[in-house]
Amino acid sequence: MSDLDYLVIAPHPDDAELGAGGAILLLKAQGARVGVLDLTDGEPTPHGSPEIRRQETEAATAVLGLDWRGNLGLPNRSLVADLPARHRLAGQIRQLRPRFLFAPYWEDAHPDHVAASALVDAARFWTKLTKTDLPGAPHYPQRIIYYFSVHLRLHPRPSFVLDISPYLEGKMQAIACYQSQFIVGRPTDPPTILDDLRQRARYWGWAVGAGYGEPFVCREEIGLRGLRDLV
């Protein structure tokens, strides 16, 4: 397959949609090649199963119009950023050759999310190594962009907020594909978890003078080629 422009790496199926669903839809509308790599299958959960999660992931993938989606098969609930996991992730990145990586924000209550963030950091470094048994040629993604799919009530200070106003409904549709996670067994009285997600997007849109937004963080400085697209 052709190289990807962006690879969103997620601890579980649904995290990419939660933290970067609007960005994915925007990038696809701009003609970018976008993929998602789920590190685990997300199971066990109270109302899911491996088969249910596969079906939900396929439905969300269709909504997002992804160019590629895969699963690294690492263990849910006990994800660790160890050397075997780093080797597998770095090898996958070298094969897909994305220009940019998206990863979960490093501060979270969920140990899988913390481990996933550290794993992406380490794997990115490994992707450029020579004299190694990693598959593919050396490759080094330009930036890691961190998205927020967190279990803490943080008030982040983002590096930038992306205006996702035209893509908010598509993002919500993709999230709603994961009924076992966000609908089945959840309270039906408003505000529901989907209401909460919409309100968060509205807040970040309001913060930058737009309708709806998604916040992102970069540890490295971000360069601009112009100011035309500032909100």
Where are the language model's segments positioned?
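Metal-dependent de-N-acetylase/amidase catalytic core
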Residues: M1-I9, V80-V231
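Active-site rim/loop-helix segments in enzyme catalytic domains that contact anionic ligands
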Residues: M1-L96, V217, D229
